[in-house]
């Protein structure tokens, strides 16, 4: 049964990820990927902390939201590919700005989500 919940969550996460990818414009900054990863990091921290109370009696929903929805929404492989592409295009300044913003922003937003959600699990 958990596979069904992960599948459904993944379906919505993938659709949301696709919609966000339309924000990637020719500016060179993959805004859709940045937003997906930052929002996903925040929600993972928030929902993981909140899960002690909210998902206590619903572990299948937790699995569907965290592994399914957030797993499909966020993307490390696309992030890495975008960094390599920036390197190949000699966009070194953008590579560092995007890379550091994504990495540090993801950690900060995850931490902020944990703090808002309560005690970590």
From Swiss-Prot:
**MF-aspect GO terms:** fluoride channel activity; metal ion binding
Q: Which residues bind Na(+)?
A: 71, 74
Q: Name one GO biological process term.
A: cellular detoxification of fluoride
NAD in keyword set:
no
Catalytic activity annotation:
fluoride(in) = fluoride(out)
Transmembrane stretches, by residue range?
Answer: 3-23, 27-47, 64-84, 92-112
**GO cellular-component terms in the record?**
plasma membrane
List locations, semicolon-separated: Cell membrane
Q: Which residues form a coiled coil?
A: none
Q: Does the keyword Chaperone apply?
A: no
Q: How is its activity regulated?
A: Na(+) is not transported, but it plays an essential structural role and its presence is essential for fluoride channel function.
Q: Which of UniProt's keywords are assigned here? A: Cell membrane, Ion channel, Ion transport, Membrane, Metal-binding, Sodium, Transmembrane, Transmembrane helix, Transport
Membrane topology reported for the UniProt record: Multi-pass membrane protein
Q: Which domain of life is it from?
A: Bacteria
InterPro entries recorded for this chain? FluC
Regarding protein family, the annotation reads:
Belongs to the fluoride channel Fluc/FEX (TC 1.A.43) family.
Function, as annotated, reads: Fluoride-specific ion channel. Important for reducing fluoride concentration in the cell, thus reducing its toxicity.
Protein name per its UniProtKB record: Fluoride-specific ion channel FluC 2
Q: Which organism is it from?
A: Staphylococcus haemolyticus (strain JCSC1435)
